[in-house]
Amino acid sequence: MTVALSNLPVLETERLILRAPCASDFPALAPFIMSDRSKYVGGGADKDETHAWRVLAILTGHWPLRGFGTFVLEDRKTGAPIGSAGPWYPAGWPEKELGWTIWTEEAEGKGFAYEAVLELRRHTYEDLGWTTAVSYIDPKNTRSIALAERLGCTLDPDAAGPDPDEPLLVYRHPSPEALA
């Protein structure tokens, strides 16, 4: 028996369908989590399928716990899941985050994360009523730093990160008013 999360939003952009994660995303997510490409988001070559499954379960479980969560980025042309992005706010975190990952090298550098985050930022401000959002980024993750800056985010050196033992850069997204 498969149980689906119902009544979750599905958003669309020119090239993407943004939807909640599901079990069929595992074959695309697992290789990413088990590679060094995911080292900035809790994965890495030392991780196994069990760890990757837990990541999928965490992404999925955030939805019923918070009423929002990370979306899977599905390529409209191929139907393939190519990444994830969206609102994220685990217990104990100082602020609500907009995060993103691209799962395959083939999908990197094509603007998919940018396209998704623009729509997801609109969604969080207009539909969820957020008034601010940050993105927590590892200082070595130059691609995500560049994307945050392209999105108009600014480094907020006074903002706290989620873990004092893991120093992350805090990039603040423009406010809804600044984007209007």
PLM region spans:
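Active-site rim helix/loop that mediates acceptor-substrate recognition in acyltransferases
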Residues: D48-G67, R76
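Acyl-donor (CoA/ACP) binding surface of acyl/acetyltransferases
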Residues: M1-A45, A57, T70-A180
